[in-house]
Amino acid sequence: MFLSERVKEPSRIPLSNESEEAVGGSAENANTVDDEDAKTEVSNDRIDNENNTATASSGAVHNEYTSIDAEGPEKEPLATHGLSMELISDISTSKEVQKHLEKTEPETTSTSKYSIQSDTSSKSDSSPNSGTAPKRASSLKPGLDSDSTLKADSSPKSASEAKTTIRFVPIGSTPRINPLVFTISSNQTVSILIKFLAKKLKTKDHVYLYIQNSFQPTPDEKLSDLYNLFRTNNELIVSYCESVAFG
């Protein structure tokens, strides 16, 4: 009997004052932790509500931009024609740059072209811009038109190019030749005139020549020397006959 009663009644150990205070303090700490957990849950709920509000506002903004795009004109799809997207972007960029350059290009080019065309159209103008230099006065000969221009002689003609005009005059009954005026090279001698007259007169006899109707030149004299000394009206007068006429 005594053993059963001891088992049924639990043994109680008396607690000191310090242990009781510790137990009470732990209970208070537990209550404080519970309050902080509750506050944390409330703050988390507020954060979730704010996130939901921000999401809703962003959705509204997105819907607003979507509606604007929907109201605008539809963009036509870019025809790729088998080209890569990188190449297409490069082509579009180059076209934009070219358009920008065309807009920013100065207008001086068109004006300069117009001025050049207007200058070349006026042929009568003798200004340097007309493209035609004025004719030199030295290239024009008095008494000639402006179209019949002659090149200025930069160097004197050589003896082989110089010409001498000879006028033949028959003496007495000597036959007349036609024409009477001839042009011959100045470096020739009198002998060529004798041969020429003998051929024209068809005579085997000797032909005699006279200058100024006064003296007979030697066959080896140059015509240029005789012309410079005895010319008359830019001609050398040579008289001829088939017999001795003077002296």
From Swiss-Prot:
Ranges of compositional bias, category Polar residues: 50-66, 146-158
Cross-link (Glycyl lysine isopeptide (Gly-Lys) (interchain with K-144 in ATG5)): 247
One cellular component term from this protein's GO annotations in UniProt: Atg12-Atg5-Atg16 complex
Region (Disordered): 1-158
Gene3D superfamilies: Phosphatidylinositol 3-kinase Catalytic Subunit, Chain A, domain 1
GO terms of biological process kind: autophagosome assembly; autophagosome maturation; autophagy of mitochondrion; glycophagy; piecemeal microautophagy of the nucleus; protein transport
Topology of the protein relative to the lipid bilayer: Peripheral membrane protein
GO molecular function: Atg8-family ligase activity
Signal peptide: none
Keywords: Autophagy, Isopeptide bond, Membrane, Protein transport, Transport, Ubl conjugation pathway
Biological function: Ubiquitin-like protein involved in cytoplasm to vacuole transport (Cvt), autophagy vesicles formation, mitophagy, and nucleophagy. Conjugation with ATG5 through a ubiquitin-like conjugating system involving also ATG7 as an E1-like activating enzyme and ATG10 as an E2-like conjugating enzyme, is essential for its function. The ATG12-ATG5 conjugate functions as an E3-like enzyme which is required for lipidation of ATG8 and ATG8 association to the vesicle membranes. ATG12-ATG5 rearranges the association to the vesicle membranes.
Protein's UniProt name: Ubiquitin-like protein ATG12
Source taxonomy: Eukaryota, Fungi, Dikarya, Ascomycota, Saccharomycotina
